[in-house]
Amino acid sequence: MARVKNGIVHVARRKRLLKKTKGFWGTKKSNYKKAKDTLRKGMMYATRDRKARKRDFRSLWIVRISAALTGMGITYSRFFEGLKKSNIKLNRKILSNLAIEDIETFKKIVYEIKN
């Protein structure tokens, strides 16, 4: 039976993996075994953190809206209850940006909800 040589594919596979580990610290960027493990773990973290980022931003928006509402004498839960009743269709991201960048518009929305 003939011997199967796999040199070119073998080198290309390693090269492709080591290219992905550029910027890693120490031997984790140059040692194939360590690079492979670190890259696999990094991909797991990336997947997990893509999910976590959505939760983190939502909680950030809630904190920002709540902080802006505290000075206006209305709670976050009452504010969103009023939004639903007033049929104002703005999401938390937009409201958060309004609370930071355009406080006058945000105050008008709060006034609309209070009345």
Swiss-Prot record:
Gene3D superfamilies: 6.10.160.10, Ribosomal protein L20. Keywords: Ribonucleoprotein, Ribosomal protein, RNA-binding, rRNA-binding. The keyword Cytoplasm does not apply. It comes from the Bacteria. GO terms for cellular component: ribonucleoprotein complex; ribosome. GO terms for biological process: ribosomal large subunit assembly; translation. GO terms for molecular function: rRNA binding; structural constituent of ribosome. SUPFAM superfamilies: Ribosomal protein L20 (SSF74731). It holds the Pfam family Ribosomal_L20. Binds directly to 23S ribosomal RNA and is necessary for the in vitro assembly process of the 50S ribosomal subunit. It is not involved in the protein synthesizing functions of that subunit. Belongs to the bacterial ribosomal protein bL20 family. HAMAP family: Ribosomal_bL20. PANTHER family: 39S RIBOSOMAL PROTEIN L20 (PTHR10986). This is Large ribosomal subunit protein bL20. The lineage of its organism: Bacteria, Pseudomonadati, Spirochaetota, Spirochaetia, Spirochaetales. The gene is rplT.
